[in-house]
Amino acid sequence: MEQRKNVYPSFTLRKVIITVNNFLVEDIERVMTTVPDNETSRELSSVIFCLGRDAENEEEYDYAFSKLLELYKRDNETVKAWVIEAFSLLAVLKRDIKKLDRSIVEPLIRTAYSRSVGSDRAMIQDAIDNINQSLNWGL
């Protein structure tokens, strides 16, 4: 009986787990300064999502929110979509700590949505749906 060869390439996945609690402020700053404003990277997306997901108290929430606002200013529509998604994580997961400031977030969401296309637009729409459901907004 002939033995079949594995026709699929073999590879190993590197498991990367990053949380804000494991990120030092210096690490967050390093990622934010090393990735150019008009580019994306896996590490930058990890920082953005962790900022939205891992705040454990009001001080961390305020820090995360300010960093997300800073990242939103980048000249990259994908980064803006990631930031909007992180805002939705704050809205859904961290509303017991603090609520999103609608007067700040809503104009950013509307602007990002109007300029977005493809998967960025879909991500922003999902974030809008999550924010609307969590905070009873009508974006």
Language model features with spans:
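Eukaryotic acidic, Ser/Thr-rich intrinsically disordered low-complexity regions
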Residues: N21, R110-L139
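Hydrophobic core positions within HEAT/HEAT-like alpha-solenoid repeats
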Residues: L44-F49, V83-I84, Q125
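N-terminal "cap/leader" segments of large eukaryotic alpha-helical scaffolds
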Residues: E2-S46, L139
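HEAT/HEAT-like alpha-solenoid repeats
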Residues: I28-E39, S66-K73, E77, P107-S114
